Amino acid sequence: MKLHLKYLWIVLVACTLTACMNGGGDLAGKWQLRQYQYADGTSEKVDSVFYNFQKGSFSAICLLKDGGVTTFFGNYSLKGAEISIILLPESVNDKNYDTYFGWPEGKRTFKVEDLSYSSLRLEYEGQKSIFRKF
């Protein structure tokens, strides 16, 4: 009987740990963009953009100045210290695209400078985008 309880306990712990895994490592989930840091040393605070990463799917929720919301969709791939984001054509054609993205051809590859359970820092040509887990 004790042996059965021991195995049952091991199975329950394994199931619990598996259920807690998000399948995308530390990157999976919602991130709030907090700041841009530019190569010239200046910075810009941001609080109205949220990136979401989940099993290869990407979305960005952007709060508009008029109180509305717009969402951009795409895909991402994380390979080593680089993340590539490709937005769907419908998102690139959105009237707010240039305000929030403006990436040529709707795609960008960032260097991942920092990725932990609570912070994310992406770099592209000297510009850093700093996020916090939301």
Residue ranges: model-predicted function:
Residues 1-20:
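Sec-dependent bacterial lipoprotein signal peptides
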Residues 20-75, 79-134:
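Lipid interaction determinants
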